[in-house]
């Protein structure tokens, strides 16, 4: 693959560069890095729960934080 992943977050298109190590891990898991942009990002449930707890006084920021973490 090219080492780049296109990520589209509503109203914010981004292109992220995969490190060589990340690309190798994805390939070992059977993922084709060139098709990653077509796959949904899965955020582990504990991460979502923890984010919501940390940001419960700023609920509008919780989704932004999850989006940002998922884009990395």
Swiss-Prot record:
What Pfam families does the annotation carry? Answer: AAA_lid_9 (PF17871)
Keywords, sorted A to Z: ATP-binding, Chaperone, Chloroplast, Nucleotide-binding, Plastid
Q: Which InterPro entries match?
A: ClpA/ClpB_AAA_lid (IPR041546)
Keyword rRNA-binding assigned to the entry: answer is: no
Task: Kindly list the GO molecular function terms attached to this UniProt entry.
Answer: ATP binding
Subcellular location per UniProt equals: Plastid, Chloroplast
Task: Answer whether the UniProt record assigns the keyword Transcription regulation to this protein.
Answer: no
Could you state one GO cellular component term attached to this entry?
Answer: chloroplast
Q: According to the lineage, what is the superkingdom?
A: Eukaryota
Query: What family classification does the UniProt entry report for this protein?
Result: Belongs to the ClpA/ClpB family.
Tell me, in a sentence or two, what this protein's role is: May interact with a ClpP-like protease involved in degradation of denatured proteins in the chloroplast.
Name of this protein: ATP-dependent Clp protease ATP-binding subunit ClpA homolog
UniProt organism field:
Populus euphratica
The upper taxonomy is:
Eukaryota, Viridiplantae, Streptophyta, Embryophyta, Tracheophyta
């Amino acid at each position: 693959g090219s080492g780049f992943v296109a990520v589209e977050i509503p109203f914010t298109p981004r292109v992220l560069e995969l490190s060589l190590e990340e690309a190798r891990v994805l390939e070992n898991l059977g993922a084709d890095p060139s098709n990653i942009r077509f796959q949904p990002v899965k955020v582990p449930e504990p991460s979502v729960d923890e984010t919501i707890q940390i940001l419960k006084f700023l609920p509008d920021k919780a989704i932004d934080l999850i989006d940002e973490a998922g884009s990395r």
